């Protein structure tokens, strides 16, 4: 009984890991600014949202993404809804790519991700400048975009491994259900 309970907790943790990572990254402003590298930062929520929206995982739903954006605005001190809009724009681009893609390719996804974060950041910072008169350091934004783009490839590799583990877990749970049904018959 306890081993079954432990495995069910592990399965649940692995299934909800992208959601846990999303909220952990928006709550603590996942960044490497504490290393005192002036222009080294990357936007982990962009990578996470684009990848999991592209791969059609239902765990990371649009409602959770919207709420994570609201939390991100509160942490960063941005006007409410700006990050949510940016995150949903990224979801829209990922959904479009998912629907038009015949053969998925990490390399093509990677360059489409660059286009996506350029558009999303442009809209985000345009709104911040136009309506809220927030000063923007373009060198920091450029560094953030470049490092986010470069790190997408690395994180996509690890997310692919995690996705394969999740698919095995889902198939195992279906097999367990079939075995339980057979025992009842």
Q: What are the residue ranges of the model-derived segments?
A:
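Terminal, non-globular segments
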Residues: 1-185
